[in-house]
């Protein structure tokens, strides 16, 4: 929450009797609100440790006399819901990279961000997880360890600017080996869609020329720098193969807007049930919009695929994965 929206906070405070700040861990926002002269409460009510679950917040409010001792009963239906692992969003630009990495089966270092979801099924294509920028340092170590196969790391554009430049420079200076994949989706998506120097917007809502990530990497001494359209499966695969074959430090920048940044979905894709062979390859894309239908393949008995039109944003990665061209835009259905 920076810069703090002081005008908005004052307008809110003027319309209520009491201001209560609910935030996990340290009273970061609470202290700033109090510094504005607003008598806010927070950590005298809520715990400074651990995660604040809804029931914990309600109990703390009851103890502080903010809520009545009795609360309306509610039915917890979570136990009856089917469980599933977290997934990359429909239309996520990282999907093609992790799909290719899962096929190439190379060691992959990660740090923290949306791309951590590449660790989970169906990709299983990221093997370490750490702090922001840790992936580049771990990749450097992998290269020094004498791994027989090439190794790569994944890092987001925002994380690269925040904590990835220094370890990349160190890797080049010390003659490391490996491929740094900078997944440029024009935002820091998992932690709140903060802007970074790679886009035109500034914190003061002005516009500037964005920092060129490729140019910055070359300035750090990286000689092999490639870019690829994140939604072009074949282009990403070709660039990955070229970078991992390079004897030294290479950088691959995959470019594609986060679906919450572009906000311009294309028409949903459609599965031709007559062409679908129920091979399941599109399901391996890990897209939540690609699901199993009730239609069954007559020979194998396996369920065919279909696409949820409400959630599909038409990125087209599933169409490129399908081996029989059974997925197309609605104009070709």
Task: Walk through the language-model features, giving the residues of each.
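Terminal amphipathic helices with adjacent charged low-complexity linkers/tails
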Residues: 2-71, 329-333
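Short gly/pro/ser/thr-enriched loop/turn and capping motifs at secondary-structure boundaries
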Residues: 3, 27-29, 47-50, 115-117, ...
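General beta-strand structural signal in soluble alpha/beta enzymes
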Residues: 21-23, 40-43, 68-72, 108-111, ...
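Iron-sulfur cluster-binding cysteine motifs and their immediate structural context
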Residues: 28, 269, 277, 281-306, ...
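Active-site glycine- and acidic-residue-rich loops that bind
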Residues: 53, 78, 86-94, 158-162, ...
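Active-site diphosphate/adenylate-binding microenvironment
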Residues: 72-136, 145-148
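Thiamine diphosphate
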Residues: 119-253, 263-267
């Amino acid at each position: 929450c920076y810069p703090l929206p002081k005008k908005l906070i004052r307008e809110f405070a003027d319309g209520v009797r009491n201001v209560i700040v609910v935030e996990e861990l340290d009273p970061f926002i609470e202290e700033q609100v109090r510094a504005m002269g607003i008598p806010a409460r927070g950590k005298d009510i809520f715990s400074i440790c651990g995660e604040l679950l809804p029931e914990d917040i309600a109990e703390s409010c009851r103890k502080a006399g903010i809520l009545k001792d009795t609360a309306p009963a509610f039915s917890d239906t979570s136990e009856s819901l089917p469980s599933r692992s977290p997934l990359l969003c429909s239309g996520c630009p990282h999907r093609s990279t992790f799909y290719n990495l899962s096929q190439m089966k190379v060691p992959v270092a990660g740090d923290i961000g949306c791309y951590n979801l590449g660790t989970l099924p169906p990709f299983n294509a990221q093997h370490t997880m750490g702090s922001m920028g840790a992936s580049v340092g771990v990749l450097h170590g992998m290269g020094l360890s004498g791994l027989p196969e090439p190794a790569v790391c994944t890092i987001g554009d925002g994380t690269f600017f925040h904590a990835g430049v220094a370890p990349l420079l160190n890797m080049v200076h010390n003659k490391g080996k490996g491929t740094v994949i900078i997944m440029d989706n024009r935002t820091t998506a998992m932690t709140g869609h903060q802007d970074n120097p790679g886009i035109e917007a500034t914190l003061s809502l002005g516009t500037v020329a964005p920092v060129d990530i490729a140019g910055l990497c070359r300035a750090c001494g990286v000689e092999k720098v490639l870019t690829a359209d994140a939604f072009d499966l074949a282009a990403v695969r070709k660039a990955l193969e070229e970078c991992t074959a390079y004897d030294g430090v290479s950088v691959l920048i995959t470019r594609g807007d986060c679906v919450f940044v572009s906000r311009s979905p294309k028409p949903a894709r459609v599965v031709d049930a007559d062409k679908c062979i129920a091979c399941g390859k599109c399901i391996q894309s890990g897209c939540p919009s690609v699901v199993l239908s009730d239609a069954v393949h007559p020979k194998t008995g396996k369920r065919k695929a279909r696409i949820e039109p409400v959630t599909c944003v038409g990125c087209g990665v599933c169409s490129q994965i399908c081996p029989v061209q059974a997925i197309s835009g609605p104009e070709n259905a």
